[in-house]
Amino acid sequence: MSVLKKNRRKDSDTPQEPSEKAKEQQAEAELRKLRQQFRKMVESRKSFKFRNQQKIASQYKEIKTLKTEQDEITLLLSLMKSSRNMNRSEKNYMELRLLLQTKEDYEALIKSLKVLLAELDEKILQMEKKIANQKQIFAKMQEANNPRKLQKQIHILETRLNLVTVHFDKMLTTNAKLRKEIEDLRFEKAAYDNVYQQLQHCLLMEKKTMNLAIEQSSQAYEQRVEAMARMAAMKDRQKKDTSQYNLEIRELERLYAHESKLKSFLLVKLNDRNEFEEQAKREEALKAKKHVKKNRGESFESYEVAHLRLLKLAESGNLNQLIEDFLAKEEKNFARFTYVTELNNDMEMMHKRTQRIQDEIILLRSQQKLSHDDNHSVLRQLEDKLRKTTEEADMYESKYGEVSKTLDLLKNSVEKLFKKINCDATKILVQLGETGKVTDINLPQYFAIIEKKTNDLLLLETYRRILEVEGAEAEIPPPFINPFWGGSALLKPPEPIKVIPPVLGADPFSDRLDDVEQPLDHSSLRQLVLDNYILKENRSKEVRGDSLPEKVDDFRSRKKVTM
């Protein structure tokens, strides 16, 4: 509404009022905005109301739980303050004092017995040391009194020393050879490193030259294209010049043939005319000089005809200019011919260089292919390694699943035992985030409560037995029975501990060496050591096999007790 009032004030302030349609449109737009705001406010109100209802319900639940806890606490306080419970607690207090007194007496007795046992153990150790010393002294005396055995032992030790020295000398010689080989290999490595550096430098230089050759080949190709275009233009021009030259030669030949025919005709006519006039005078002279005159006339006439033709060819009538033009054309043609031959030679050289570069490119491609193959082999090895690691990870995950299953079973058994012996879990449930189930975090706390409960039960059982003994005044004390649901009958009675004294006899290995009369080599000594090692392994396996059934029986008895 305030927005409408403001709009009305603005409309009243404007000097020119808008039309009714514009006013209706503005009013409808304002109405839409107000409806949207109203819807948003209704939705926000609903959400706020829903959250408040949830908070109130949760607070009601907390109030109920607190009331129930208050009722339980008041009930416990009333029970604790009752006279019956007070008397019982006093009675339990007296019983516990008595039990603690007996416990202290027994602990003092146990300490004294432990001290006595420690003294006896020390005496036993001293006696064993004395017996061992006496046996060693006796054995040494026997060996000292047996010179044959001593001689044999000395001979065996000398042979061993000889073999060891020979082996040591061999090792020294091989060590010296290996040192020499290592030094040689070091020198070779230095030489190979130098060669490698040189080859690396050469490779870099070859790469640079290859790049330059590629650039030059590209430039040469461009120049070749230009030269080919020039050659094509020159060939076209040459064809045109040759065609023009052929036409001119044909025209000159035609003119020469016509003039020669005309000259022959005139000569014939002239001869016929003068034949009658000078027949008598020059008959002999003509006969003698006929051939010479004829040749001279023909050469002169041919010169005249050639001179006339050259004059016709010359545009300005200057023969020197015609000769200079002809010589210039010949020089240009000769220069063009030499340029074309040089271009052909350059093209052949560039073709050879491109062929050599193509061979080098093929070689580099083959090397690149080999490097790609090596990379593929390395990738295959890495894939195999990844596959093995994934298999190991899957195996460890399966083991983790099995261990988690066994841990869940143990948690369930602990929870059952906790409920079965009626242990109090209020200390654990008070903590934050506890739901009353056994987890990895609160498992030690459950174990501590179970241990405390078992100690209390054992104290009660011992107090009950003391009362029974005092009441019955029996001479033979009754056997100890576990209070946990009669499970002690299933336990195996403890067997007496067998103390096996150490055998102080001679070593079988030394006995075998004593039995051997001849000196031993390396292979026979190795065989004796292997036989001795196999005997020791068999004895340890037998001892383990004897102790394994006892461990199995102990594990079964413990399992029955826990069940």
Curated annotation (Swiss-Prot):
Keyword Coiled coil listed: yes
Chain intervals for the UniProt region annotation (Disordered): 1-29
Record has GTP-binding as a keyword: no
Signal sequence residues: none
One of the GO BP terms on file: cilium movement
Annotated InterPro entries: ODA-DC/CCD, ODAD1_CC
GO CC terms in record: axoneme
Compositional bias of kind Basic and acidic residues: 10-29
Alphabetized UniProt keyword annotations: Coiled coil, Differentiation, Spermatogenesis
Role according to the record: Plays a role in spermiogenesis. Involved in the elongation of flagella and the formation of sperm heads.
Name of the molecule in the record: Coiled-coil domain-containing protein 63
Organism: Homo sapiens
